[in-house]
Amino acid sequence: MKVYIIDYHKDDPKRCTGKKLVKLKIAEFTRVGKGVVLDPFAQITLSNKDKDIVRRIGITIVDTSWNNTSQSEFKNIRGEHRRIPILFAGNPIHYGIAYKLSSIEALIATLYIVDEVEEAIKLSNVVKWGHTFIELNKELLEAYKNKTEEDIKKIEREIIEKILEK
């Protein structure tokens, strides 16, 4: 499975998990989107329908800082733009915050959702807090795994409603 990183050089290089993926030869840098482009602003949610594209072409992660990101950074990237459904960060910088995943967490989530669970778990070993991300989101990841976009959006709405009730 191919993993591509578009690096906008806005992240602290010491904490940048996208660069770490490249350094470990799990991913390679690119300037163009290929396959499924993970885009937090996308209208379409990642689902089992994307499994074939992920396996044949790959996954593109845009590595940028959450503090400086905007929709315009994603606008001109070609590929199948997909949004990861609600999950909570396990990384020390954004721990417990919904949607604010690191590049490696986004990749782990993508692999899990398209039913590449073994690969996702193996990848979680790359960072100290990788297993924390999976444990924190285990129930959600299992609920999203191999589901249609409609099913995933329904689960996501239920989660958001529960959060808003509190």
Curated annotation (Swiss-Prot):
Pfam assignment, any one: Fer4_RLI
Localisation: Cytoplasm
Reactions listed under catalytic activity: an N(1)-methylpseudouridine in rRNA + S-adenosyl-L-methionine = N(1)-methyl-N(3)-[(3S)-3-amino-3-carboxypropyl]pseudouridine in rRNA + S-methyl-5'-thioadenosine + H(+)
GO CC list: cytoplasm
Main subcellular location of this protein, as a coarse class: cytoplasm
Binding site for S-adenosyl-L-methionine: 17, 62, 84, 99, 103
Any single biological process term in GO: enzyme-directed rRNA pseudouridine synthesis
InterPro entries: RNaseL-inhib-like_metal-bd_dom (IPR007209), Tsr3-like (IPR022968), Tsr3_C (IPR007177)
Functional note: Aminocarboxypropyltransferase that catalyzes the aminocarboxypropyl transfer on pseudouridine corresponding to position 914 in M.jannaschii 16S rRNA. It constitutes the last step in biosynthesis of the hypermodified N1-methyl-N3-(3-amino-3-carboxypropyl) pseudouridine (m1acp3-Psi).
Family membership noted in the UniProt record: Belongs to the TDD superfamily. TSR3 family.
NCBIfam families (alphabetical): PRK02287.1
Official protein name in the record: 16S rRNA aminocarboxypropyltransferase
Organism of origin: Saccharolobus solfataricus (strain ATCC 35092 / DSM 1617 / JCM 11322 / P2) (Sulfolobus solfataricus)
Lineage: Archaea, Thermoproteota, Thermoprotei, Sulfolobales, Sulfolobaceae
